[in-house]
Amino acid sequence: CYAQREDDKCMLRLRMTAGSMPKDKLKFIVDSAKKYHISKIHFTTCQAVQLHNLGYKALTELAEAGYDHGIITRGTGGDNPRNTMCSPLSGVEKGEYFDVMPYAKAAGEYALTLIHQGKIPRKYKVVFSNSPKNASHATFHDIGFVARSDGKFDVYTSGGLGPNPRMGVLIDTAVDPKDICYYIYAQWKTFSEHGNCQNRGRARTRYLIELCGGEEEYKKVVYQNLADIRKREDLTIHIQPSAVTKTGDGTTIEGDRVIAQKQEGLYAIEWHTVGGCPQVDELEKLYETIKDFEDVEVRLGSYETAYIINLTASEAKKVLEATEDSAVVSEFEH
């Protein structure tokens, strides 16, 4: 959470790991906003949800209640691993290499275990990309896993925007997805050993290359940390792949905000509100529309856009109608 400029007002950031917001979490946000009269809700570029203008009592109660609904607020600000990001249409996007969402969620759980471990960067962003579109911008974050056509990942590290921006360094290719946590820890450990925490403006992994003496020396440090970690720990993850089994209703739909999924007959609807700040009544209208739809969930993207996925054509039409008044349609409004 963060203190706001106004006296006695705070913002609480809710992790939506990999941008996944199932219907029960959407309902929690709607119910909480009504209960505490929350005036501003914001979808962030890190695919999280921010609740603004909270009093101290509401802040503490919401943090505790969120945990009961599978929503983690710990480490969402400050010197911590931030919300793990992912291509928002992973698993349903036409042309994707493979569904990276399960790996992003596993990485998000693992990243939480790194809190308070050693000297840490001011932010640590773990990102997954599922297709050549690279919708999550995995190539310029602290560590990015970019899907390949062979079902493996290329790994980029020490990228970032802000002052002195830089693209990530391609640290390894054809990495087995079960090994992603080794790389997340190795990059974290590299910063712990070589990062600059004395200067807050430079306490980011994108400065590691120069601190290590150049790209090649930096790579050597990361590779050595990888080798050491593999000797000491077993960080292998085991994912049971799941597939969308829902089928279409025999009809089709087209439109500017309609995205045909790779599952025949199913669609996603894009919903971008002004500034990525939906009103409470707009969120409630969306929830009431989709609450009984099978296998439907909301995905948040890095442009503060929401996507409602796994809709039949008739369901998609209802979601379009429910979001018509609140959705922006021009590039300028985006």
Where are these regions (language model features)?
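Peripheral terminal and linker regions in Fe-S/redox and tRNA-modifying enzymes
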Residues: 1-334
